[in-house]
Amino acid sequence: APIYNVGEVKDNQAFVIEADDESCPVDLKLEYMFGKPPKTVLTDISEKSNFDDLYFEDSKFNEYLTDVLRLEAVACKDWLTNKVDRSVTGKVAMQQCTGPIQLPLNNLGIMALDYQGKKGIATAIGHSPVNALINAEAGSRIAIAESLTNLVWAPIKGKLSAVSLSANWMWPAKNKGENARLYRAVEAVSKFAIELGINIPTGKDSLSMTQKYPDGNVVYAPGTVIISAVGEVADINNAISPRIQTKLGSKLVYIDFSSHSLELGGSSLGQVINRLGKKTPDVSDAKYFANAFNTLQKLITDGEILAGHDISSGGLVTTLLEMNFSNTEFGMSIDISDFNEDLITVMFNENPAVVVQVNDTTKLEKELKAKGINFKIIGSVIEPRMISITKDSKNIKLDVDRLRDIWFESSYILDQKQSGPQYAHCRYKNYRRQELSFDFPSHFSGKAKDFGINLSRRERSGIKAAIIREKGVNGDREMAYAMHLAGFDVKDVHMTDLINGREDLSDISFIVFVGGFSNSDVLGSAKGWAGAFLYNEKAKKALDSFYARNDTLSLGVCNGCQLMTELGLIYPEHPEKPKMLHNDSHKFESGFVNLDINENKSVMLANLSGSRLATWIAHGEGKFSFPYFHDQYNIVMKYSYDVYPGNPNGSDWSTAAICSNDGRHLAMMPHLERAFFPWQWPYYPEDRKDDEVSPWIEAFVNAKKWV
């Protein structure tokens, strides 16, 4: 898109337009347009806080750890992430969840810019409200630091200087001492960002964070700034996950980003023992921080980093545990004897820092020493499923799986409020039992050319297909690209085109009803969309004529599956059609689930028979309910696990997809069009890193071959 430099900002309080001949047709003082209102002057008194320092005992390490892992800021956020669509657009390269049991542990999110290239946009957040209670300036700097130690795991084009921040101020302003604290916090953020060499071009504020009650009680929210950091990703395939790679003997390295003494003030540990503390973590040297950020970026770009995680809420011990939680095997041997501080301070401090996993420390040590970055080699990956922590003569052994259940428990308690006790308990009981596993077809090479796919195709193939859209759907673009990749020339057909007669589908051999929320699901899933076909003569005629032909294929995904079921398009010979009911959990479900493809004669899925794959689900009404016995249906795909959440909706016989008796018409709830590239999978077989496409692309290639 064209971009033009049309002017510059000055401090002359005037709006000036200069012509090419150096004349000045417009030269207005801003006061002529906006008046000259008086400047607002806020007067406040600085209040000096005096919080109790922390007192702790090494002997209570396990007690402290259990309480910290249950703290909402530290505990599992599964109850939040499982109810929002994390795959829509098909451009999600990294979302919250990672690993074979898909736990929400990722440091950042990444959206691909398109389906062909490697570039993307990364975003991460940081906040530090408890630190800011003690020290508004330090807490605000820590918020920026946390956002950046989360963002650093994506290879940012231009490194730190190319990052932009957004600042969202949440503050109980206009209360005694709070305006003064806010002023100091804003000033600290401004200076820190300038010293880092990054900009804050946008943000917002909510300065009424005070709750007053009829009995006279007043509650202040802790003043904090929530920082969102954004940067362009050079290669989405090189982003680093916190999940430890199962490489025995690989090393774990602690890298300091703060250049500051280790402090426990404002920490999660302080909260669980009901003390704030006097001294908080801080970043002593912005240039040092920037240097550490850019050095780690280089190591990531050079392929030296296997896994990595920031240290923030919960401290170093939480970081180490979380790096193990999303796996089901292996552990760590950790030795922190090189730290001068005591065991509790080392393991629970939240100073800005990271832990990385590397195969060989040689290059990492050389780079960090050359740049003057403080680091310590603290351990290695071991086979026993535990974390062994040594500090001088002390040794503590942590049961990773037991502590993971404790960490997940808070999510389970909160989930009861939305899924109900039964299904919240099912999720809590089964999350660790429903590990993702794969059995790819033996013929699948992962190479695009082996399927006749030209990844950069521009010319027409002459084989027409159509996306059928209704207002509210949102899965059309990823579906269109999957079809295009397979070799179709894809036409965009909206329901208004069919209703008005502009399209009649006579030149189309393959139609796809896409996913989303047609008509906002106001009438129920796809009920309004079905009505648009049933009660509009031209649309109904076009649909009936299409299905009367013997040379046609159709696919319905998610909302499209609900539509095909509502219209009875899969089994028109049945007097009573299947129904799509609300999920048994009574809420929207989003997840990456295992699927077994049964032996079948479906045009699109036949040569994937016997496979175990995985893809995204995102629906609120995905439960197949069948009026007849099992043998009356061609159930081509099932959820690999019969119980929730592996079967996310409670479908009869764990059904995920059905097809017509002749194999030409397929309806499925999972989104195969959001997983045709390996980078779209949040967990892909580790021995298939060279794959260009995933097995799901074969469904579209099969459709093209048949047509």
Language model features with spans:
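Glycine/proline-enriched, intrinsically flexible loops and inter-domain linkers
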Residues: 1-510, 514, 519, 532-544, ...
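A structural signal for short, well-ordered beta-strand segments and their strand-loop junctions
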Residues: 5, 254, 555-557, 667-668
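Short, well-ordered, mixed-charge alpha-helical segments that flank or form enzyme active sites
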Residues: 13-15, 208-210, 236, 562-566, ...
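Short glycine-/acidic-enriched loop or helix-start segments at secondary-structure transitions
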Residues: 263-264, 477, 522-524, 564-567, ...
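Active-site glycine-centered loops adjacent to acidic/histidine catalytic or metal-binding residues
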Residues: 310, 558, 671
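FAD-binding core of FAD-dependent oxidoreductases
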Residues: 313-316, 560-563, 615
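Amide-donor transfer/coupling interface in amidating biosynthetic enzymes
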Residues: 378, 501-503, 544-545, 578-707
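Cysteine-nucleophile active-site neighborhood
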Residues: 517-602
